[in-house]
């Protein structure tokens, strides 16, 4: 689109923007979090807002428009003589002097919640300028108009009295009131009460970038409420008649603010709905004082964004494409920043600016047009992010410029502030100013000579007070004696660095002092006014002062930052705790990482994030250093030292080196942290991008396409599942029609995997279901899924049923289908169904159906619309994992990635707006349409319902009926689909056929012109055809394929040459839409591949379950030759993993002499995995297991610290040898000279309950028995050995045994038996405490009125269990500990011999526990608390 065209469009959309900033201030000083010194900005910001008046803006700033400003509009007064005073000060002076203050021009105060009668006496209400009947127009009108209108209403003076009183009544205490004061107080109180009844006014402090003329346009569109003036007056009279019986008149008085916020009904939410800026833009710019840049400032942003994106794409557009690439980026920046176009709009309707075409002449003389894609949707989102970043940087830089101007600085180091392009560079300059000119800044504040400086500035700069005193003291002569200033030193470093430190000369030479440092300090300390009389303290002060000057010098900082950026080296130092990291740890590959460059970490972003995660856990320390530091430091020092050779000169050089070391110690530490933080942000961004890419693949798929139909047609679906797949599990099914209606449910108690008879019965019942229930409407696809790998058997059974009974695809609506194929049986993606089955949505829709039936509905809905099913999860989608390293970034970043993917796909598909009005399930899509958001979407639906009778007939109605503002209409209109009835033979003139296409209304004339050219119509014919029903209608009647004959390239050239409009891609898009409107352009429905099904049902990936992976397996069957008892060998073994993967162990993979028994758990290594059949082959050979235990990652000799690894191994071995040397041997078959770790490794492949005896670290009179509680869970019990006469006794847990065999049988195995009983109890759940917590939370959310409790292993104390319970959904999870003993269980000091008794005892104990809390509450509170409901609720524990 040509520049003139864009400017014309912008003028039409916002003709009032030119004067938007005439009455606005610019002074908003930044608050950065880069460094401790960043608090300066926060302090400066607070002074600006309340104490000092802004100077007039310069002409360039007056032309800028403000967006999303977060501060109050600056006060303006009518009297020029009062301009020197702040408005608040003026009003305060006038109030104290008894004068009547002039009416406030536009003073706005923060809206506070109005309190009811009960709380009115406790807290003072603040209504301020927001009360009154004038409505929105009064708030935003100019001062003169405001005066007139309020005078007409007869309340100008009263309103201002109320403003002053509200603001200062708590600030000024008067000793006594006169009669007039009391009368005035009474009237003001009445006014406040009247204002409270009217409800709060609109808080315009949140309206950024909205000038008065723009607001006037908004009120013309939405009304100002003046037509209801009579009703408000009548209500007021009625309320006054009722006396004290006041009824609440605002939402704030009826609902809690939290509830209003949840429903998006707060004042801020309404402002977002009103402002003519896309809601997503408002959301991301909320913390910015967003400025509409123009001219050179806009070009600066465009260049900044283009350079960053060009570097990130690593030269993908080098050569002749570099310039077109940067031009495309610049254009997108303009679209986003100035035109407020959202990404989908730019991608769809400004695609010509994202392409570069060139004409290539062929050898035969013909010309080929080659098109290069410069930017993709991911790039547009990145530009959007960079726009936010730049404006944050720009805002901080402008604040620094204002501070420099206020201080009137003449300093070479601050002159180039406009060229600073990084946040750290701006922060470095601010630190320099704060340090160097701290005295001037304090004086500036004290004198109030300028505006925009923070009230807390003196407090902030007190840390520089000592340096200020030294600068003004005789002691500063010693700083000057270093012979070179920090500024000169910085210039030397900058010059030498630019020449790579290869030139011998320097810009500034270092002068040598005639006195030695010691003599000079002693002489200065003799001065009466010297700060430090002690020479040692004085020397330290001098050193620190010069070091601080070097530390704060921006040029020195720039050199350090540049060096770290180019030569940084990241390494890991293992802590004592981190030495426990083994080959199976997620941090194994970073344990001894060294010499990692920033480029290495950016290529593998998860590596740095795992490093930082391990650092946060105290396992490692991540160190960022620079390569060859000593050599680099020497080069820097050469810019500081003198060339003299005397003893005095050497002493001064030593002092200089000492000071430089002091400064560089802080500098490198600071820059190291900055570098680490910058790398972290970049790696998080890359992880988030990968999450977005993976999630896009999930939702970029059309519904499953029925046989014979076009892509995008929704199928009839039959979903089947038997859940866990136990033998007694029923098979449940749900049938969904293409409309989404759940038509039939199926249930068979005959599980087909039980036996052959059950399989036959199941097939017969399913056949009967097809013949009777599905006779009129056959499914187009059968989807099968479940909770685990056993579902593969059901899948095979259903597929066999289809083949055996020749169940063919649905062809009732098709013609000429001779041999229809069999109906397709596919695996269903279960992640959305798993969350749906326990959701509130499922409970409401199918309250009378079992959980598995809801699960089947979720499966079927996914097949009909993956996009809608993911969208329906809401924030629950965060529980799903789309990328293995997703957990390394915050949920906010994950949600942003997911939401951007939603926006892309939903706008690609479009939303049938009238369906969204009728169906909340479809309405979920609307907030993600370009320009809209949850608030604007809800407002749009509400306006359509109220103004148009629940149907939007045309896109143009959005503007004509004032349903949308201009910018929002431009962004969203083409993505709102309004289909027409293709069966009508007559043309309805009220229907715009192009509203059923992706063509934007701005291109409707272009589409009609193309249609006319395709029909060979001239202008007269066009007018006639328009009268007969329209050109588009005529094209559809004659055949849309006629547009295929148009020469779009020539047409595009004509548009560009004559009108300056780039429309090549737009023309092609219009042509496609005319031929096939809103065609399904998503990818086809993705049928899960074998490895995806394997991961879905087992939780294993192709990386976690592959060759040489060690896994525990349970022996199901052992094949052995029992005829030869002496030499019998195990021929084979059938095994199963915990995830129900079936496996075989052949004879060659079984060690000789091993004894295997059914039910035994052994450690095995995977030889081959067959993902499609959920089977694998395993080996038990020691050599294979050792191979599987080896590290799975490559150790680069240049990037792995082998020396440290070997040293740690040697220390560990020496420690173990020393431990073994202290131990003794006893004669017992279970005794082994093991350490605790060796004992655990030995027991790992053994059965649960097996144990070993081993030496104890307590001494020779002790032993330790280690027994296997569960997989990877072992309990170590200390045994005390006492000699009693001729025999011995063994004491464990205060129980005595005569020998070790008795101890093992009566104590260890008894405990193991109770552990096994616990694990078999239905209230027990496997998994970590966090996993069990998640299950308990989700269960109580699904059953909010039920109580629930559950047992799980205490992984921190093996042999103990955790009892977790929730009284109801609103109470926190409480955890009690249960100890397993040889004679039962112990809970809260009580013993229970069985699980039944334990559960009953827990319930009784809990009731006593609740009663005790209630009794204590009664004794401490004046009013009794009724806990009876809580106690009685915890009666049933079923789930």
Curated annotation (Swiss-Prot):
GO terms for biological process: cellular response to stress; G1/S transition of mitotic cell cycle; negative regulation of transcription by RNA polymerase II; nucleosome assembly; poly(A)+ mRNA export from nucleus; positive regulation of transcription elongation by RNA polymerase II; regulation of mRNA 3'-end processing; transcription elongation-coupled chromatin remodeling. Its main location: nucleus. GO terms for cellular component: euchromatin; pericentric heterochromatin; transcription elongation factor complex. Residues 1-206, 1417-1439 are annotated as: Disordered. Keywords: Chromosome, Nucleus, SH2 domain, Transcription. Residues 20-42, 77-92, 117-126, 140-150, 166-182 have a biased composition (Acidic residues). CDD domains: SH2_Cterm_SPT6_like (cd09928), SH2_Nterm_SPT6_like (cd09918). It is found in: Nucleus; Chromosome. GO terms for molecular function: DNA binding; histone binding; nucleosome binding; transcription antitermination factor activity, DNA binding. Residues 1-16, 151-165, 183-206 have a biased composition (Basic and acidic residues). The keyword Nucleus applies. Residues 1229-1323 form the SH2 domain. Residues 62-73 have a biased composition (Basic residues). The keyword Transcription applies. InterPro entries: HHH_9 (IPR041692), RNaseH-like_sf (IPR012337), RuvA_2-like (IPR010994), SH2 (IPR000980), SH2_dom_sf (IPR036860), Spt6-like_S1 (IPR049540), Spt6_acidic_N_dom (IPR028083), Spt6_death-like (IPR042066). PANTHER family: TRANSCRIPTION ELONGATION FACTOR SPT6. Histone H3-H4 chaperone that plays a role in maintenance of chromatin structure during RNA polymerase II transcription elongation thereby repressing transcription initiation from cryptic promoters. Mediates the reassembly of nucleosomes onto the promoters of at least a selected set of genes during repression; the nucleosome reassembly is essential for transcriptional repression. Essential for viability. Belongs to the SPT6 family. This is Transcription elongation factor SPT6. The gene is SPT6.
